[in-house]
Amino acid sequence: MFYHISLEHEILLHPRYFGPNLLNTVKQKLFTEVEGTCTGKYGFVIAVTTIDNIGAGVIQPGRGFVLYPVKYKAIVFRPFKGEVVDAVVTQVNKVGLFTEIGPMSCFISRHSIPSEMEFDPNSNPPCYKTMDEDIVIQQDDEIRLKIVGTRVDKNDIFAIGSLMDDYLGLVS
């Protein structure tokens, strides 16, 4: 799910950036350091929307670097168990499907794929399909899945998904 939340970050700036464009440099460095990153607590930082406050810089003794505390608002993506999301299939093999939900990767075990869908290793590309070939899921297809579990690391979030519910599967 997407959230718009207030966050804080500290920017460490080299003395060569001191000058008339100091604040623009701090803003630019904030965008490059936080956008696209993942924190276990808040999820993936998609975009910085506003910068609320750039605090007074604190000079680091013996180094000359300055540390600026920055308060900002950002849009973050944090998946939860039970959430239904759309994903893109990146890999299909006999153990299941590997998908991407934006910046997050998700695995769907073959035991969480409906029993009427069988893996066909002889097709090119490999796919899961029904007996009448009415539904075929292969690489680069868009599917709708339910998140049944997440694993949160320090810098990444990984999910386990399922297609065993109503209205889940291939999005046409």
UniProtKB/Swiss-Prot annotation:
Keywords: DNA-directed RNA polymerase, Nucleus, RNA-binding, Transcription. This is DNA-directed RNA polymerase II subunit RPB7. The keyword RNA-binding applies. The gene is POLR2G. GO terms for molecular function: single-stranded DNA binding; single-stranded RNA binding; translation initiation factor binding. The keyword DNA damage does not apply. Pfam families: S1 (PF00575), SHS2_Rpb7-N (PF03876). Changing residue 41 to E: Strongly reduces RNA-binding. Belongs to the eukaryotic RPB7/RPC8 RNA polymerase subunit family. One of its GO terms (biological process) is positive regulation of translational initiation. It is found in: Nucleus. Gene3D superfamilies: Nucleic acid-binding proteins (2.40.50.140), RNA polymerase Rpb7-like, N-terminal domain (3.30.1490.120). SMART domains: S1. Its main location: nucleus. It comes from the Eukaryota. Changing residue 153 to E: Strongly reduces RNA-binding. It comes from Homo sapiens. Changing residue 14 to E: Strongly reduces RNA-binding. Component of the RNA polymerase II (Pol II) core complex consisting of 12 subunits: a ten-subunit catalytic core composed of POLR2A/RPB1, POLR2B/RPB2, POLR2C/RPB3, POLR2I/RPB9, POLR2J/RPB11, POLR2E/RPABC1, POLR2F/RPABC2, POLR2H/RPABC3, POLR2K/RPABC4 and POLR2L/RPABC5 and a mobile stalk composed of two subunits POLR2D/RPB4 and POLR2G/RPB7, protruding from the core and functioning primarily in transcription initiation. Part of Pol II(G) complex, in which Pol II core associates with an additional subunit POLR2M; unlike conventional Pol II, Pol II(G) functions as a transcriptional repressor. Changing residue 93 to A: Reduces RNA-binding. CDD domains: RNAP_II_Rpb7_N (cd04329), S1_RNAPII_Rpb7 (cd04462). Core component of RNA polymerase II (Pol II), a DNA-dependent RNA polymerase which synthesizes mRNA precursors and many functional non-coding RNAs using the four ribonucleoside triphosphates as substrates. Pol II is the central component of the basal RNA polymerase II transcription machinery. It is composed of mobile elements that move relative to each other. POLR2G/RPB7 is part of a subcomplex with POLR2D/RPB4 that binds to a pocket formed by POLR2A/RPB1, POLR2B/RPB2 and POLR2F/RPABC2 at the base of the clamp element. One of its GO terms (cellular component) is P-body.
